[in-house]
Every structure is written in structure tokens, then in C-alpha cells.
């Protein structure tokens, strides 16, 4: 199968390596402002990996020419933070062809709909099937351009939904060889809500701001950054997320329970579960507060949850407090920026029942 991977960061290189390891012909694309891994993969002819997946896997092409990456592609993975989805969609728009599958990996806030909007596709358009995953399939870090370390490949708790959801089974069948543990979600509201990053990352970062600024992230983010008090904040945010899911008729698995299913954690608790987690061992904190744990997971993820809660009548006082505090720390108005909400996706006028019907 011919696979195009858009995004050459941690996740993109992880997806490209794994797909190539399963015998697929992989092309890697990124924008010109991100040349590091593209140049390295061009020079080396592929991607090197260490960790639970090891070795070297060839990549057919790596470059900044989107038409070359998409030509003949059966599956297109858009892999990057939430703010990459719209640019990926817009650059793909003239080159997408009928029958292709696009998977936004991961989506924390309606990434599949954001891609459809950016690519000029109708919500119910099935000529090009667009889907999203609930999270990245790996804990992965770039060691250097073109060289990655995969700490964990999810053993379960990885969900996928297409728009409309009736195409979910078809997409799963196409990716089953690489992701055998991937499961069908009810719809993209479930995949969007099941992403735990907005629950975990902002809380841990917020409670460790002094340590991050003082040490430039020279500590283990999960093993050293989580204490019982930090765990209580994570749990409070998680409760509000789960309540939104209940109102929308979708099951949201509590984050520690999901962490055990995925193979990150050995126990389903909000404190020691992270502190002793085998899948997070060795993962360092970010070197700066100006990082996706605030800019994406608050600016997109938590703002999306807060606005969605408002829409369906679920109070989110803890989520709102985290947004307010982080906005003050970063001298930004994340709520006012409203980078991605149900309104920006074109879905703010619908009730919970109407959304369920619309996305089915």
C-alpha cells in the first residue's frame, strides 16, 4: 500500500517508520519551515529507530512537494499538533483524489472535521474518507533529525472514527496490519474526548512551572512531575471531561484506566499510576513553557472542552480555572483566541441529540 505521512516530527516519523516496517511504501512530507528531519531522511534514505521498535526502515521519498507525496497514496496520515491540521488540509486540497483515506492522527478536538473544512469537503462527503484517531499510537521522541526512540506502542485503548461514522469499519480494515489494537469509536466526539493529553499535560506543566523554568526541563515529566496533589488536579479535569461525554452519549474511559489498557501505566490511579508508569519512564519535561502542552493542550484541547461543555450544559469550573491560570502565565487569552471550538467547526448550533445523528 502507498502511504503518505504529513508531518516529520516525533509522531510523523513514528508512523512512517512503523508503516514502512510493515512493508508499505511510505512518502514523508513537511512544510519548508521544518527541514530538519526531511533533510536527514533524504540523506539517510529512511528513518532509524530505537526502543521497543528498532532498526532502520527505508522511505520512498521525503520532501516538501505535497503533490509528490500524495500521488498514488492510498492512505494519508496527517500527524502533528492540532494547529497543523488546517495547513495540512489546505495544502492537500488541490491534490486529493477520490478513494483516498485521510487519517488525522491524533485528534483532540474534531480534527477530522477541521481537515474536511480546510480541504473544502462537505461533512457528509464520502468520496474522500476522512477519519481521526483518539491519540498518537506511540510514546515517541526525536533523538535527532531522522532518528527516533519509541518508548511504547499502544497495546489497546486506541480508537478511530470516520466522518460519517458508518465508514469507520472500512478505515479500520485498511490499517489493521499496522495497528491491530485499534478499535472503532462511536463517532468523532468519542475520539476527540478520549484524547487524554488536555487532561494530563496542562495540569502537570502548570504545577511544575518553576521547575521547568529553572531546570529547562531537566527532570522526568511523569515520574517526578506528578505528586498526589498534581494527581488530584488531573482527576478533577478528567471528571469534567467524562461528564461532557456522558451528556453526549459517548463513553470516555478515565485516563488512568486507559493508561493501563494502553500499556503506559501499571495501576489505574491519578498519582502513583503516573509516578511508576513503565511506559513513561525516561520521558523528560519540555525545556520551555512555550510548548504544545500549553499552546495545544490548553489553547485547543481545554478551550474546546470548555466550549463544548457550555453548548451541552455541562459545567467545567476546573477546566476554566486551568485555562485562566495558563493564559495569565503565558500572557495570552487562550479562551478569547478560540483556536478551535464547535463554533469554528460549524457545529455550535446543534443539541447533543442532533450531533449524534449528524455524525453517524
Language-model features: locations:
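NAD(P)-dependent Rossmann-like dehydrogenase/reductase catalytic/cofactor-binding core
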Residues: 224, 231-360
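Rossmann-like NAD(P)(H) cofactor-binding subdomain of soluble oxidoreductases
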Residues: 82-144
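NAD(P)+-binding Rossmann beta1-loop-alpha1 motif at the extreme N-terminus of oxidoreductases
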Residues: 1-51
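Rossmann-like NAD(P)-binding element
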Residues: 53-95, 100-103
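Short mixed-charge
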Residues: 45-59, 127
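Internal alpha-helical scaffold of NAD(P)-dependent oxidoreductase catalytic cores
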Residues: 144-220, 224-258
Amino acid at each position: 500500500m502507498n502511504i503518505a505521512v504529513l508531518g516529520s516530527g516525533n509522531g510523523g516519523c513514528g508512523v512512517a517508520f512503523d508503516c514502512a516496517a510493515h512493508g508499505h511504501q511510505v512518502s514523508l512530507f513537511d512544510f519548508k519551515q521544518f527541514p530538519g528531519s526531511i533533510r536527514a531522511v533524504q540523506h539517510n534514505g529512511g528513518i532509524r529507530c530505537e526502543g521497543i521498535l528498532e532498526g532502520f526502515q527505508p522511505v520512498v521519498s521525503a520532501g516538501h512537494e505535497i503533490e509528490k507525496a500524495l500521488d498514488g497514496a492510498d492512505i494519508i496520515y496527517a500527524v502533528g499538533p492540532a494547529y497543523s491540521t488546517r495547513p495540512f488540509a489546505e495544502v492537500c486540497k488541490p491534490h486529493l483524489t477520490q478513494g483516498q483515506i485521510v487519517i488525522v492522527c491524533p485528534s483532540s478536538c474534531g480534527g477530522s472535521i477541521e481537515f474536511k473544512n480546510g480541504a473544502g469537503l462537505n461533512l457528509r462527503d464520502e468520496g474522500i474518507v476522512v477519519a481521526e484517531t483518539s491519540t498518537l499510537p506511540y510514546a515517541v521522541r526525536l533523538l535527532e533529525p531522522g532518528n527516533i526512540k519509541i518508548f511504547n506502542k499502544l497495546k489497546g485503548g486506541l480508537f478511530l472514527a470516520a466522518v460519517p461514522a458508518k465508514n469507520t469499519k472500512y478505515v479500520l480494515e485498511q490499517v489493521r496490519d499496522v495497528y491491530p489494537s485499534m478499535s472503532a469509536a462511536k463517532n468523532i466526539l468519542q475520539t476527540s474526548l478520549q484524547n487524554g493529553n488536555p487532561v494530563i499535560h496542562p495540569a502537570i506543566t502548570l504545577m511544575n512551572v518553576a521547575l521547568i523554568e529553572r531546570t529547562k526541563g531537566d527532570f522526568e515529566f511523569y515520574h517526578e512531575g506528578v505528586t498526589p496533589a498534581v494527581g488530584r488536579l488531573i482527576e478533577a479535569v478528567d471528571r469534567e471531561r467524562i461528564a461532557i461525554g456522558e451528556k453526549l452519549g459517548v463513553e470516555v474511559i478515565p485516563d488512568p484506566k486507559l493508561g493501563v489498557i494502553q500499556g503506559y501505566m501499571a495501576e489505574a490511579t491519578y498519582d502513583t499510576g503516573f509516578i511508576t508508569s513503565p511506559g513513561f519512564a525516561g520521558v523528560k519535561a519540555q525545556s520551555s513553557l512555550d510548548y504544545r502542552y500549553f499552546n495545544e493542550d490548553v489553547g485547543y484541547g481545554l478551550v474546546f472542552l470548555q466550549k463544548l461543555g457550555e453548548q451541552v450544559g455541562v459545567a467545567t469550573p476546573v477546566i476554566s480555572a486551568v485555562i485562566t491560570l495558563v493564559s495569565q502565565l503565558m500572557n495570552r487569552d487562550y479562551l478569547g483566541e478560540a483556536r478551535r471550538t464547535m463554533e469554528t467547526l460549524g457545529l455550535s448550533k446543534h443539541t447533543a441529540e442532533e450531533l449524534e445523528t449528524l455524525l453517524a
